[in-house]
């Protein structure tokens, strides 16, 4: 008699995904979204460079009603974590960090971040990535966090490398950019790696 294969064990979504924490660093504070963030994101998403770096169609974030509906629903999500990035020096919301695409059996998530012009070139993005990746491994008990970064965004890739993300491979010509095509690099960081360097692999 053939044995009937057992059903795979599906790891439930962590309860911690329902908790939207406040994470405090030296330069940035990550917190749940508030109503006032909508105006900040409308300005950020209207920036042509932001639209290009994120692969978003021009004008996609210009509708305040759509933005308000989106960001007002982020704190209620139970299978992902969306947090606003706040510059502690000014109190301004300058971007966001997101852990999404939860894969229960493999304890993995996708990561993405968006930092507007007001938050660039001062280490805010690097610290924000470290804070949320650390939370993902230490509180959400993730095993793997992955991302994709476009070839025309070396600044973002350097940030990810500083935190310990490792390039795994290339997705060829995944984005139409003007008259050409752009590749993207797949990067990831694993829980055992984080346990060793805690976001400072080159220290």
Q: Can you describe what each PLM-predicted range is?
A:
Residues 33, 135-137, 165:
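Conserved hydrophobic/aromatic "anchor" residues
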Residues 39, 126-138:
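Amphipathic alpha-helical segments that line or abut small-molecule/effector binding pockets
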Residues 122, 126-127, 151-169:
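Conserved active-site alpha-helix within GNAT-family acetyltransferase domains
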Residues 110, 117-118, 122-123, 127-130:
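Acyl-donor binding region in acyl/amide transferases
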């Amino acid at each position: 008699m053939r044995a009937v294969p057992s059903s795979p064990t599906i790891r439930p979504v962590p309860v911690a995904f329902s908790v939207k924490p406040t994470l405090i660093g030296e330069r940035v504070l990550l917190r749940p979204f508030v109503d006032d963030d909508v105006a900040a994101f409308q300005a950020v998403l209207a920036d042509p460079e932001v639209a290009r770096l994120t692969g978003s169609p021009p004008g996609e974030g210009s509708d305040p009603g759509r933005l308000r509906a989106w960001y007002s629903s982020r704190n209620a999500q139970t299978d992902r974590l969306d947090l606003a990035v706040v510059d502690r020096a000014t109190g301004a919301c300058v971007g966001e960090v997101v852990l999404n695409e939860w894969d229960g059996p493999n304890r993995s998530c996708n990561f993405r971040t968006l930092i507007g012009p007001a938050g660039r070139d001062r280490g805010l993005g690097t610290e924000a990535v470290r804070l949320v990746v650390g939370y993902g491994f230490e509180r959400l008990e993730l095993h793997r966090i992955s991302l994709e970064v476009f070839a025309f965004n070396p600044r973002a890739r350097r940030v990810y490398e500083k935190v310990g993300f490792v390039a795994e491979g290339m997705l060829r010509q995944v984005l139409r950019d003007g008259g050409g095509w752009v590749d993207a690099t797949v990067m990831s960081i694993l829980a055992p790696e984080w346990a060793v360097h805690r976001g400072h692999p080159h220290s």
